From Swiss-Prot:
Lineage: Eukaryota, Metazoa, Ecdysozoa, Arthropoda, Hexapoda
Protein name as catalogued: Protein adenylyltransferase Fic
GO biological process: protein adenylylation
Topology in the lipid bilayer: Single-pass membrane protein
Family, as annotated: Belongs to the fic family.
InterPro entries in alphabetical order: Fido (IPR003812), Fido-like_dom_sf (IPR036597), Fido_containing (IPR040198), TPR-like_helical_dom_sf (IPR011990)
SUPFAM superfamilies: Fic-like, TPR-like
Top-level taxonomic group: Eukaryota
Catalytic activity line of the entry: L-tyrosyl-[protein] + ATP = O-(5'-adenylyl)-L-tyrosyl-[protein] + diphosphate; L-threonyl-[protein] + ATP = 3-O-(5'-adenylyl)-L-threonyl-[protein] + diphosphate; 3-O-(5'-adenylyl)-L-threonyl-[protein] + H2O = L-threonyl-[protein] + AMP + H(+)
Alphabetically ordered keywords of this record: ATP-binding, Hydrolase, Membrane, Nucleotide-binding, Nucleotidyltransferase, Repeat, TPR repeat, Transferase, Transmembrane, Transmembrane helix
Length: 499
Protein backbone atom coordinates (compact mmCIF):
# COMPACT_ATOMS: atom_id res chain seq x y z
CA UNK A 1 0.00 0.00 0.00
CA UNK A 2 1.25 3.49 -0.79
CA UNK A 3 2.02 5.52 2.36
CA UNK A 4 1.19 8.84 0.67
CA UNK A 5 -2.15 8.19 -1.11
CA UNK A 6 -3.30 5.02 0.76
CA UNK A 7 -3.82 2.93 -2.40
CA UNK A 8 -2.89 -0.78 -2.59
CA UNK A 9 0.03 -1.73 -4.75
CA UNK A 10 -0.73 -3.84 -7.81
CA UNK A 11 1.14 -6.85 -6.43
CA UNK A 12 -0.76 -6.80 -3.18
CA UNK A 13 -4.07 -6.39 -4.98
CA UNK A 14 -3.36 -9.37 -7.19
CA UNK A 15 -2.40 -11.48 -4.18
CA UNK A 16 -5.62 -10.69 -2.37
CA UNK A 17 -7.67 -11.58 -5.42
CA UNK A 18 -5.92 -14.94 -5.66
CA UNK A 19 -6.60 -15.69 -2.00
CA UNK A 20 -10.28 -14.79 -2.46
CA UNK A 21 -10.65 -17.09 -5.46
CA UNK A 22 -8.88 -19.90 -3.57
CA UNK A 23 -11.20 -19.49 -0.60
CA UNK A 24 -14.26 -19.59 -2.81
CA UNK A 25 -12.99 -22.75 -4.53
CA UNK A 26 -12.37 -24.41 -1.15
CA UNK A 27 -15.83 -23.48 0.06
CA UNK A 28 -17.37 -24.82 -3.14
CA UNK A 29 -15.51 -28.13 -2.82
CA UNK A 30 -16.56 -28.46 0.80
CA UNK A 31 -20.20 -27.78 -0.11
CA UNK A 32 -20.12 -30.32 -2.96
CA UNK A 33 -18.55 -32.91 -0.65
CA UNK A 34 -21.24 -32.33 1.94
CA UNK A 35 -23.98 -32.58 -0.69
CA UNK A 36 -22.49 -35.78 -2.10
CA UNK A 37 -22.35 -37.29 1.38
CA UNK A 38 -26.00 -36.37 1.95
CA UNK A 39 -26.98 -37.91 -1.38
CA UNK A 40 -25.10 -41.10 -0.55
CA UNK A 41 -26.81 -41.26 2.84
CA UNK A 42 -30.25 -40.75 1.27
CA UNK A 43 -29.57 -43.46 -1.32
CA UNK A 44 -28.25 -45.87 1.33
CA UNK A 45 -31.18 -45.18 3.64
CA UNK A 46 -33.66 -45.64 0.80
CA UNK A 47 -32.05 -48.93 -0.19
CA UNK A 48 -32.07 -50.16 3.39
CA UNK A 49 -35.73 -49.21 3.82
CA UNK A 50 -36.69 -50.92 0.56
CA UNK A 51 -34.78 -54.07 1.50
CA UNK A 52 -36.45 -54.13 4.89
CA UNK A 53 -39.90 -53.77 3.36
CA UNK A 54 -39.27 -56.56 0.84
CA UNK A 55 -37.92 -58.85 3.56
CA UNK A 56 -41.02 -58.25 5.64
CA UNK A 57 -43.36 -58.84 2.74
CA UNK A 58 -41.65 -62.05 1.71
CA UNK A 59 -41.75 -63.46 5.22
CA UNK A 60 -45.08 -62.21 6.53
CA UNK A 61 -47.30 -61.43 3.57
CA UNK A 62 -49.34 -64.28 2.01
CA UNK A 63 -47.01 -65.95 -0.46
CA UNK A 64 -49.71 -66.63 -3.02
CA UNK A 65 -49.92 -62.82 -3.47
CA UNK A 66 -46.27 -62.44 -4.37
CA UNK A 67 -45.15 -65.76 -5.78
CA UNK A 68 -47.24 -67.89 -8.15
CA UNK A 69 -47.26 -71.50 -6.97
CA UNK A 70 -47.58 -74.69 -9.01
CA UNK A 71 -49.77 -77.34 -7.47
CA UNK A 72 -51.13 -80.68 -8.61
CA UNK A 73 -54.84 -80.97 -9.44
CA UNK A 74 -57.00 -81.79 -6.44
CA UNK A 75 -58.29 -84.92 -7.97
CA UNK A 76 -55.34 -86.82 -6.45
CA UNK A 77 -56.11 -88.94 -3.37
CA UNK A 78 -54.11 -88.65 -0.21
CA UNK A 79 -53.15 -91.22 2.40
CA UNK A 80 -56.60 -91.19 4.01
CA UNK A 81 -58.02 -92.71 0.89
CA UNK A 82 -56.22 -95.98 1.77
CA UNK A 83 -57.55 -96.14 5.32
CA UNK A 84 -61.14 -97.22 4.80
CA UNK A 85 -63.04 -98.43 7.83
CA UNK A 86 -66.41 -98.57 6.10
CA UNK A 87 -65.94 -100.13 2.69
CA UNK A 88 -69.24 -98.68 1.48
CA UNK A 89 -67.86 -95.14 1.45
CA UNK A 90 -64.58 -94.77 -0.41
CA UNK A 91 -63.69 -91.17 0.41
CA UNK A 92 -66.11 -89.49 -1.99
CA UNK A 93 -64.16 -86.20 -2.37
CA UNK A 94 -61.74 -88.03 -4.65
CA UNK A 95 -64.36 -89.24 -7.08
CA UNK A 96 -66.06 -87.47 -9.97
CA UNK A 97 -69.54 -88.53 -8.85
CA UNK A 98 -69.43 -86.21 -5.87
CA UNK A 99 -67.93 -83.31 -7.74
CA UNK A 100 -70.81 -83.57 -10.22
CA UNK A 101 -73.30 -82.87 -7.44
CA UNK A 102 -72.94 -79.13 -7.92
CA UNK A 103 -74.27 -79.44 -11.45
CA UNK A 104 -77.66 -80.55 -10.17
CA UNK A 105 -78.56 -77.24 -8.56
CA UNK A 106 -77.25 -74.11 -6.92
CA UNK A 107 -77.20 -75.48 -3.39
CA UNK A 108 -79.35 -76.30 -0.41
CA UNK A 109 -82.46 -74.14 -0.14
CA UNK A 110 -82.89 -74.69 3.59
CA UNK A 111 -85.64 -77.29 3.24
CA UNK A 112 -83.29 -80.25 3.29
CA UNK A 113 -83.54 -80.75 -0.47
CA UNK A 114 -81.16 -79.66 -3.18
CA UNK A 115 -82.84 -77.51 -5.78
CA UNK A 116 -83.24 -79.49 -8.97
CA UNK A 117 -84.84 -76.95 -11.26
CA UNK A 118 -84.50 -78.17 -14.84
CA UNK A 119 -81.65 -76.38 -16.51
CA UNK A 120 -81.24 -78.42 -19.66
CA UNK A 121 -83.26 -80.58 -22.00
CA UNK A 122 -81.98 -83.88 -20.62
CA UNK A 123 -83.04 -83.10 -17.07
CA UNK A 124 -86.45 -81.86 -18.18
CA UNK A 125 -87.01 -85.05 -20.14
CA UNK A 126 -85.70 -87.15 -17.24
CA UNK A 127 -88.14 -85.58 -14.79
CA UNK A 128 -91.00 -86.00 -17.24
CA UNK A 129 -90.08 -89.66 -17.68
CA UNK A 130 -89.92 -90.05 -13.90
CA UNK A 131 -93.41 -88.63 -13.51
CA UNK A 132 -94.87 -91.04 -16.07
CA UNK A 133 -92.93 -93.95 -14.52
CA UNK A 134 -94.51 -93.25 -11.14
CA UNK A 135 -97.95 -93.19 -12.79
CA UNK A 136 -97.28 -96.54 -14.50
CA UNK A 137 -96.09 -97.97 -11.19
CA UNK A 138 -99.31 -96.82 -9.49
CA UNK A 139 -101.37 -98.44 -12.26
CA UNK A 140 -99.51 -101.73 -11.80
CA UNK A 141 -97.77 -101.59 -15.19
CA UNK A 142 -94.36 -102.58 -13.85
CA UNK A 143 -92.73 -103.40 -17.20
CA UNK A 144 -93.45 -99.95 -18.62
CA UNK A 145 -92.53 -98.32 -15.32
CA UNK A 146 -89.17 -100.12 -15.27
CA UNK A 147 -88.29 -98.92 -18.77
CA UNK A 148 -89.30 -95.36 -17.94
CA UNK A 149 -87.29 -95.35 -14.70
CA UNK A 150 -84.25 -96.63 -16.59
CA UNK A 151 -84.74 -93.99 -19.29
CA UNK A 152 -84.91 -91.22 -16.67
CA UNK A 153 -81.80 -92.55 -14.96
CA UNK A 154 -79.90 -92.72 -18.24
CA UNK A 155 -80.73 -89.07 -18.94
CA UNK A 156 -79.84 -87.82 -15.45
CA UNK A 157 -77.82 -90.50 -13.60
CA UNK A 158 -76.96 -88.28 -10.61
CA UNK A 159 -80.37 -86.83 -9.85
CA UNK A 160 -81.21 -87.74 -6.21
CA UNK A 161 -84.97 -87.83 -6.76
CA UNK A 162 -84.70 -90.19 -9.73
CA UNK A 163 -82.24 -92.42 -7.85
CA UNK A 164 -84.54 -92.57 -4.83
CA UNK A 165 -87.75 -93.29 -6.75
CA UNK A 166 -86.08 -95.96 -8.86
CA UNK A 167 -84.70 -97.55 -5.70
CA UNK A 168 -88.19 -97.63 -4.19
CA UNK A 169 -89.51 -99.30 -7.35
CA UNK A 170 -86.77 -101.95 -7.19
CA UNK A 171 -87.34 -102.57 -3.50
CA UNK A 172 -91.14 -102.77 -3.44
CA UNK A 173 -92.06 -103.92 -6.95
CA UNK A 174 -89.11 -106.13 -7.89
CA UNK A 175 -87.98 -107.19 -4.40
CA UNK A 176 -84.37 -106.28 -5.25
CA UNK A 177 -83.32 -104.71 -1.97
CA UNK A 178 -79.59 -104.89 -2.76
CA UNK A 179 -79.82 -102.74 -5.89
CA UNK A 180 -82.35 -100.48 -4.18
CA UNK A 181 -79.93 -99.85 -1.33
CA UNK A 182 -77.22 -98.97 -3.84
CA UNK A 183 -79.42 -96.31 -5.47
CA UNK A 184 -80.37 -94.88 -2.07
CA UNK A 185 -76.67 -94.70 -1.28
CA UNK A 186 -75.95 -92.88 -4.55
CA UNK A 187 -78.75 -90.40 -3.86
CA UNK A 188 -77.24 -89.63 -0.46
CA UNK A 189 -73.82 -89.23 -2.04
CA UNK A 190 -75.26 -86.44 -4.18
CA UNK A 191 -77.51 -84.98 -1.47
CA UNK A 192 -76.72 -86.24 2.06
CA UNK A 193 -79.85 -84.59 3.48
CA UNK A 194 -82.38 -86.12 1.08
CA UNK A 195 -85.09 -87.18 3.55
CA UNK A 196 -86.64 -90.04 1.54
CA UNK A 197 -83.28 -91.56 0.67
CA UNK A 198 -82.20 -91.32 4.32
CA UNK A 199 -85.33 -93.08 5.55
CA UNK A 200 -85.07 -95.77 2.89
CA UNK A 201 -81.37 -96.37 3.55
CA UNK A 202 -81.96 -96.76 7.28
CA UNK A 203 -84.42 -99.51 6.43
CA UNK A 204 -82.34 -101.36 3.81
CA UNK A 205 -78.76 -101.01 5.11
CA UNK A 206 -79.04 -103.71 7.78
CA UNK A 207 -80.91 -106.06 5.44
CA UNK A 208 -78.21 -105.75 2.79
CA UNK A 209 -75.44 -106.19 5.33
CA UNK A 210 -77.12 -109.38 6.54
CA UNK A 211 -77.44 -110.68 2.97
CA UNK A 212 -73.77 -109.95 2.29
CA UNK A 213 -72.78 -111.79 5.46
CA UNK A 214 -74.87 -114.82 4.45
CA UNK A 215 -73.12 -114.80 1.08
CA UNK A 216 -69.71 -114.89 2.76
CA UNK A 217 -70.83 -117.73 5.03
CA UNK A 218 -71.92 -119.71 1.97
CA UNK A 219 -68.51 -119.13 0.37
CA UNK A 220 -66.77 -120.35 3.52
CA UNK A 221 -68.86 -123.53 3.50
CA UNK A 222 -67.92 -124.27 -0.10
CA UNK A 223 -64.27 -123.48 0.59
CA UNK A 224 -64.29 -125.89 3.53
CA UNK A 225 -65.93 -128.56 1.38
CA UNK A 226 -63.19 -128.17 -1.23
CA UNK A 227 -60.51 -128.22 1.48
CA UNK A 228 -61.77 -131.62 2.59
CA UNK A 229 -60.74 -133.11 -0.77
CA UNK A 230 -57.40 -134.87 -0.48
CA UNK A 231 -54.42 -133.21 -2.12
CA UNK A 232 -53.64 -136.54 -3.78
CA UNK A 233 -57.05 -136.67 -5.48
CA UNK A 234 -56.29 -136.98 -9.19
CA UNK A 235 -59.52 -135.25 -10.16
CA UNK A 236 -58.50 -132.26 -8.05
CA UNK A 237 -55.06 -132.14 -9.66
CA UNK A 238 -56.55 -132.20 -13.14
CA UNK A 239 -59.11 -129.58 -12.18
CA UNK A 240 -56.38 -127.32 -10.81
CA UNK A 241 -54.39 -127.63 -14.03
CA UNK A 242 -57.40 -126.84 -16.21
CA UNK A 243 -58.47 -123.94 -13.99
CA UNK A 244 -54.90 -122.61 -14.16
CA UNK A 245 -55.05 -122.46 -17.96
CA UNK A 246 -58.53 -120.95 -17.96
CA UNK A 247 -57.43 -118.32 -15.43
CA UNK A 248 -54.65 -117.14 -17.74
CA UNK A 249 -56.94 -117.25 -20.78
CA UNK A 250 -59.61 -115.10 -19.14
CA UNK A 251 -57.23 -112.68 -17.40
CA UNK A 252 -55.36 -111.74 -20.57
CA UNK A 253 -58.66 -111.78 -22.48
CA UNK A 254 -60.08 -109.09 -20.21
CA UNK A 255 -57.24 -106.83 -21.38
CA UNK A 256 -58.02 -107.49 -25.06
CA UNK A 257 -55.85 -110.53 -25.85
CA UNK A 258 -57.46 -112.42 -28.77
CA UNK A 259 -55.99 -115.86 -28.10
CA UNK A 260 -58.56 -118.66 -27.87
CA UNK A 261 -58.56 -121.11 -24.98
CA UNK A 262 -57.08 -123.83 -27.20
CA UNK A 263 -54.32 -121.49 -28.38
CA UNK A 264 -53.58 -120.42 -24.80
CA UNK A 265 -53.30 -124.06 -23.75
CA UNK A 266 -50.99 -124.80 -26.68
CA UNK A 267 -48.63 -121.94 -25.79
CA UNK A 268 -48.47 -122.94 -22.12
CA UNK A 269 -47.90 -126.63 -22.82
CA UNK A 270 -45.61 -126.51 -25.87
CA UNK A 271 -44.06 -123.01 -25.69
CA UNK A 272 -44.58 -122.89 -29.45
CA UNK A 273 -45.83 -119.83 -31.30
CA UNK A 274 -49.32 -119.67 -32.77
CA UNK A 275 -49.67 -118.51 -36.36
CA UNK A 276 -51.43 -115.22 -36.98
CA UNK A 277 -51.00 -113.83 -33.46
CA UNK A 278 -48.74 -110.99 -32.35
CA UNK A 279 -45.61 -111.45 -30.28
CA UNK A 280 -47.10 -109.26 -27.53
CA UNK A 281 -50.12 -111.56 -27.19
CA UNK A 282 -47.79 -114.54 -26.78
CA UNK A 283 -45.69 -112.67 -24.24
CA UNK A 284 -48.72 -111.60 -22.20
CA UNK A 285 -49.60 -115.26 -21.68
CA UNK A 286 -46.02 -116.21 -20.80
CA UNK A 287 -45.73 -113.28 -18.39
CA UNK A 288 -48.89 -114.22 -16.52
CA UNK A 289 -47.72 -117.83 -16.37
CA UNK A 290 -44.39 -116.72 -14.85
CA UNK A 291 -46.14 -114.50 -12.29
CA UNK A 292 -48.52 -117.26 -11.20
CA UNK A 293 -45.66 -119.71 -10.79
CA UNK A 294 -43.81 -117.16 -8.67
CA UNK A 295 -46.89 -116.68 -6.47
CA UNK A 296 -47.42 -120.42 -6.05
CA UNK A 297 -43.76 -121.00 -5.21
CA UNK A 298 -43.19 -118.13 -2.78
CA UNK A 299 -46.15 -116.06 -1.65
CA UNK A 300 -48.97 -118.53 -1.03
CA UNK A 301 -47.15 -120.24 1.83
CA UNK A 302 -45.14 -117.22 2.96
CA UNK A 303 -45.36 -116.90 6.75
CA UNK A 304 -45.15 -113.14 6.66
CA UNK A 305 -46.90 -110.05 5.34
CA UNK A 306 -47.27 -109.29 1.65
CA UNK A 307 -44.92 -106.38 0.97
CA UNK A 308 -44.47 -103.77 -1.71
CA UNK A 309 -41.45 -105.73 -2.92
CA UNK A 310 -43.68 -108.77 -3.47
CA UNK A 311 -46.09 -106.70 -5.58
CA UNK A 312 -43.20 -105.33 -7.66
CA UNK A 313 -41.90 -108.87 -8.18
CA UNK A 314 -45.32 -109.96 -9.43
CA UNK A 315 -45.41 -107.05 -11.86
CA UNK A 316 -41.82 -107.70 -12.97
CA UNK A 317 -42.92 -111.12 -14.19
CA UNK A 318 -46.20 -109.91 -15.70
CA UNK A 319 -44.25 -107.57 -18.00
CA UNK A 320 -41.10 -109.67 -18.09
CA UNK A 321 -41.64 -110.77 -21.69
CA UNK A 322 -43.59 -107.73 -22.94
CA UNK A 323 -41.57 -104.82 -21.52
CA UNK A 324 -38.78 -105.96 -19.18
CA UNK A 325 -37.53 -102.39 -18.67
CA UNK A 326 -40.84 -101.24 -17.18
CA UNK A 327 -41.46 -104.48 -15.30
CA UNK A 328 -41.31 -103.99 -11.53
CA UNK A 329 -40.97 -100.20 -11.86
CA UNK A 330 -43.40 -97.40 -11.06
CA UNK A 331 -44.51 -95.38 -14.04
CA UNK A 332 -42.75 -92.09 -14.71
CA UNK A 333 -45.54 -90.25 -16.50
CA UNK A 334 -49.19 -89.31 -15.99
CA UNK A 335 -51.77 -91.72 -17.38
CA UNK A 336 -55.52 -91.47 -17.96
CA UNK A 337 -57.92 -94.41 -17.62
CA UNK A 338 -61.27 -93.50 -19.12
CA UNK A 339 -62.82 -90.91 -16.82
CA UNK A 340 -60.42 -91.75 -13.99
CA UNK A 341 -57.21 -89.74 -13.55
CA UNK A 342 -54.77 -91.77 -11.42
CA UNK A 343 -52.22 -90.08 -9.14
CA UNK A 344 -49.21 -88.42 -10.70
CA UNK A 345 -45.88 -90.26 -10.74
CA UNK A 346 -44.51 -88.11 -7.93
CA UNK A 347 -47.20 -89.39 -5.55
CA UNK A 348 -46.85 -93.10 -6.27
CA UNK A 349 -44.14 -93.97 -3.78
CA UNK A 350 -45.94 -92.60 -0.73
CA UNK A 351 -49.33 -93.93 -1.89
CA UNK A 352 -47.94 -97.42 -2.40
CA UNK A 353 -46.32 -97.30 1.03
CA UNK A 354 -49.70 -96.36 2.50
CA UNK A 355 -51.27 -99.20 0.53
CA UNK A 356 -48.73 -101.66 1.93
CA UNK A 357 -49.52 -100.43 5.45
CA UNK A 358 -53.26 -100.89 4.89
CA UNK A 359 -52.71 -104.31 3.32
CA UNK A 360 -51.05 -105.55 6.52
CA UNK A 361 -53.15 -103.64 9.04
CA UNK A 362 -55.34 -105.15 11.76
CA UNK A 363 -58.24 -103.21 10.32
CA UNK A 364 -57.89 -104.93 6.92
CA UNK A 365 -57.51 -108.38 8.49
CA UNK A 366 -60.93 -107.97 10.16
CA UNK A 367 -62.66 -108.12 6.77
CA UNK A 368 -63.84 -111.39 5.31
CA UNK A 369 -61.05 -112.78 3.04
CA UNK A 370 -63.11 -112.24 -0.13
CA UNK A 371 -63.95 -108.65 0.82
CA UNK A 372 -60.33 -108.03 1.84
CA UNK A 373 -58.99 -109.38 -1.47
CA UNK A 374 -61.54 -107.43 -3.53
CA UNK A 375 -60.72 -104.18 -1.73
CA UNK A 376 -56.99 -104.76 -2.23
CA UNK A 377 -57.62 -105.33 -5.94
CA UNK A 378 -59.60 -102.10 -6.23
CA UNK A 379 -57.17 -99.98 -4.25
CA UNK A 380 -54.19 -101.10 -6.32
CA UNK A 381 -55.88 -100.66 -9.68
CA UNK A 382 -57.16 -97.22 -8.59
CA UNK A 383 -53.63 -96.02 -7.78
CA UNK A 384 -52.56 -97.47 -11.16
CA UNK A 385 -48.86 -97.45 -10.24
CA UNK A 386 -47.52 -99.03 -13.44
CA UNK A 387 -47.39 -97.99 -17.07
CA UNK A 388 -48.95 -101.32 -18.10
CA UNK A 389 -50.17 -104.49 -16.42
CA UNK A 390 -52.10 -102.85 -13.57
CA UNK A 391 -55.22 -104.98 -14.04
CA UNK A 392 -53.34 -108.27 -14.30
CA UNK A 393 -51.18 -107.42 -11.29
CA UNK A 394 -54.23 -106.40 -9.23
CA UNK A 395 -56.03 -109.64 -10.05
CA UNK A 396 -52.93 -111.64 -9.19
CA UNK A 397 -52.61 -109.84 -5.85
CA UNK A 398 -56.28 -110.54 -5.16
CA UNK A 399 -55.79 -114.24 -5.88
CA UNK A 400 -52.65 -114.34 -3.75
CA UNK A 401 -54.67 -113.12 -0.78
CA UNK A 402 -57.49 -115.56 -1.52
CA UNK A 403 -55.15 -118.55 -1.85
CA UNK A 404 -53.49 -117.64 1.45
CA UNK A 405 -57.00 -117.87 2.97
CA UNK A 406 -57.66 -121.32 1.49
CA UNK A 407 -59.61 -120.29 -1.62
CA UNK A 408 -58.71 -121.31 -5.17
CA UNK A 409 -57.59 -118.56 -7.56
CA UNK A 410 -60.72 -116.78 -8.72
CA UNK A 411 -61.44 -116.50 -12.42
CA UNK A 412 -63.09 -113.34 -13.74
CA UNK A 413 -64.57 -114.30 -17.09
CA UNK A 414 -63.66 -112.29 -20.16
CA UNK A 415 -67.37 -112.47 -21.08
CA UNK A 416 -68.06 -110.35 -17.99
CA UNK A 417 -65.36 -107.76 -18.63
CA UNK A 418 -67.95 -105.00 -19.10
CA UNK A 419 -69.51 -105.78 -15.71
CA UNK A 420 -66.03 -105.90 -14.21
CA UNK A 421 -65.19 -102.41 -15.48
CA UNK A 422 -68.65 -101.08 -14.64
CA UNK A 423 -68.33 -102.17 -11.01
CA UNK A 424 -64.87 -100.62 -10.80
CA UNK A 425 -66.41 -97.36 -12.02
CA UNK A 426 -69.17 -97.64 -9.42
CA UNK A 427 -66.43 -98.00 -6.81
CA UNK A 428 -64.80 -94.87 -8.22
CA UNK A 429 -68.09 -93.10 -7.60
CA UNK A 430 -67.99 -93.98 -3.91
CA UNK A 431 -69.64 -97.39 -3.38
CA UNK A 432 -67.27 -100.37 -3.44
CA UNK A 433 -69.85 -102.91 -2.28
CA UNK A 434 -71.14 -103.87 -5.77
CA UNK A 435 -67.56 -104.66 -6.82
CA UNK A 436 -67.06 -106.80 -3.70
CA UNK A 437 -70.27 -108.69 -4.51
CA UNK A 438 -69.10 -109.19 -8.10
CA UNK A 439 -65.85 -110.73 -6.85
CA UNK A 440 -67.84 -112.87 -4.40
CA UNK A 441 -69.95 -114.15 -7.31
CA UNK A 442 -66.80 -114.98 -9.29
CA UNK A 443 -65.42 -116.77 -6.23
CA UNK A 444 -68.57 -118.85 -5.86
CA UNK A 445 -68.56 -119.72 -9.55
CA UNK A 446 -64.97 -120.93 -9.31
CA UNK A 447 -65.70 -122.96 -6.16
CA UNK A 448 -68.69 -124.57 -7.89
CA UNK A 449 -66.45 -125.62 -10.78
CA UNK A 450 -63.93 -127.26 -8.45
CA UNK A 451 -66.61 -129.02 -6.43
CA UNK A 452 -68.30 -130.25 -9.59
CA UNK A 453 -65.03 -131.54 -11.03
CA UNK A 454 -64.03 -133.34 -7.82
CA UNK A 455 -67.40 -134.95 -7.13
CA UNK A 456 -67.70 -138.72 -7.04
CA UNK A 457 -68.71 -138.83 -10.70
CA UNK A 458 -65.48 -137.04 -11.71
CA UNK A 459 -67.28 -134.61 -14.00
CA UNK A 460 -65.52 -132.49 -16.62
CA UNK A 461 -64.51 -128.92 -15.90
CA UNK A 462 -66.97 -126.80 -17.92
CA UNK A 463 -65.81 -123.80 -19.83
CA UNK A 464 -66.37 -120.69 -17.77
CA UNK A 465 -68.22 -119.22 -20.73
CA UNK A 466 -71.11 -121.48 -19.77
CA UNK A 467 -73.74 -120.53 -17.25
CA UNK A 468 -74.73 -124.13 -16.39
CA UNK A 469 -73.09 -127.45 -15.77
CA UNK A 470 -73.24 -130.00 -18.62
CA UNK A 471 -76.40 -131.54 -17.15
CA UNK A 472 -78.18 -128.18 -16.99
CA UNK A 473 -77.64 -127.42 -13.30
CA UNK A 474 -76.91 -123.69 -12.89
CA UNK A 475 -73.52 -122.73 -11.51
CA UNK A 476 -74.85 -119.76 -9.54
CA UNK A 477 -77.74 -117.43 -10.11
CA UNK A 478 -75.86 -114.17 -9.58
CA UNK A 479 -75.18 -113.35 -13.23
CA UNK A 480 -77.59 -112.59 -16.01
CA UNK A 481 -77.72 -115.00 -18.94
CA UNK A 482 -75.26 -114.18 -21.70
CA UNK A 483 -76.59 -114.57 -25.26
CA UNK A 484 -73.19 -115.08 -26.88
CA UNK A 485 -70.07 -116.98 -25.91
CA UNK A 486 -66.64 -115.73 -26.86
CA UNK A 487 -63.64 -117.82 -27.80
CA UNK A 488 -63.23 -120.88 -29.98
CA UNK A 489 -64.55 -124.15 -28.67
CA UNK A 490 -67.22 -122.40 -26.60
CA UNK A 491 -70.01 -124.63 -25.39
CA UNK A 492 -67.80 -127.71 -25.20
CA UNK A 493 -66.81 -129.33 -21.94
CA UNK A 494 -63.12 -129.83 -21.23
CA UNK A 495 -62.80 -133.41 -20.13
CA UNK A 496 -60.60 -133.96 -17.11
CA UNK A 497 -57.66 -136.07 -18.13
CA UNK A 498 -57.37 -134.72 -21.67
CA UNK A 499 -54.65 -132.21 -20.80
Amino acid sequence: MCCVCGEQSPDLKNGLQKQSRSARRSASKKWRYQMNSFHYFVIFASGSLFSGLMFGLLNYAPKYVLLPTRSAPHHLPDGKFLQISDEARVMEPYFPAVRMAGRLGDGNNGSGKIRTEPHDTNEQEALSSLKVAIEMKTMGKDDKAARLFQHALALSPKHPEILTKYGEFLEHNQQDVVRADHYYYQALTVNPSHSEALANRQRTAQIVEHLDQKRFERLDQKRDALSSVSDTNMALKRAEKEAYIQHIYHSVGIEGNTMSLAQTRSILETRMAVDGKSIDEHNEILGLDAAMKYINATLVNKNDFITLKDILEIHRRVLGHVDPIEGGEFRRSQVYVGGHVPPGPGDLSILMNHFESWLNSKQAFLFHPVKYAAMAHYKLVHIHPFSDGNGRTSRLLMNTLLMRAGYPPVIIQKQHRHKYYDYLQVANEGDIRPFVRFIADCTERTLDLYLWATSELSHPVPLLAQETMPDGVPLINSFEKESTIEGSGAGEAIRIGTI
